Each structure stands twice: as C-alpha cells, then as structure tokens.
Amino acid sequence: MNYNKLGKTDIKISELGFGAWAIALDWWGKKIEEDEAKRMLKKAYDLGINFFETGDMYGKGKSERLIGEVFKDMRDEIVISTKYGYDFRGVEQIGHSELPQKFDEDFTRMALRNSLHRLQTDHLDMYGLHNPKLNHIRDDSIFNVLDSF
C-alpha cells in the first residue's frame, strides 16, 4: 500500500480508503450482516488501508458504530473522516427521500459529540458537511463553528 501525508499534517494516509456507507445500508444490494462488516473492516486494515470514510447518517450511526467497535484500541493507527448535516432523529426515511438538514451551531456540536461517541474516539481527522446546499456553503457561521473545534 502506498501512503501520503494528509495535507499539511504529519498524518500518514493510505492512497486507498474504505467507504463505509455500504456496511450500514442495503439500498442497492444484499444486506451486510454486522459480523461480515467487521470482517471487511479488519481485512481492509490488514491489506494496508488505514483511511475509513463514513457519515453519521449511514444507517443512523451504524457505520460509525461498527468502525468504533473494530478500531477502538487502534485509534492512532487509522484515519477517520465522517460528515454530518442530516437530522435523522425521529424521522423515518422512505426509500431515498431527502431528510431535513441542519448546520447550526447547536446541531453541529450535538452531531460531533454523537459521532465521537459512536466512533469511540476523542478526535476526528476530518469532519465534513454532508451534501450541503449552496446557501449552507455561503453561510460563514457554519465554518466559524467548525473552526472553533
């Protein structure tokens, strides 16, 4: 596996990453059972992948939870990127319907706390906006909140 520095940091990141959306949902194929998902994550790591990309809404936190369970004792050996913005609390998603989005300060802080808890870590290497609309990108207050972390 080839590795590069992540931006201007000293973090070593694999050129290939593991996108963890599919281990939490079954929209376009066979459902992946949790034991199989954990084996997939471990196998990816054994093959040299140390970059795991997820999002809080993937299975309403399931993807993050699985990554946290597998790598809880190896946090310094992996790179985690997650994202937030969809408010899936108390909302039943029908098919591929759009969920409400929130990027305000209170929601951002709550989403971050919840992701850290599910991932069983005290920090993230990357934290992003999940599918923001143009009005969100133009809102400097969102980025001011993110910069405060």
Regions inferred by a protein language model and the residue ranges of each:
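A short, structured active-site edge motif that brings together acidic residues
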Residues: 77-89, 127
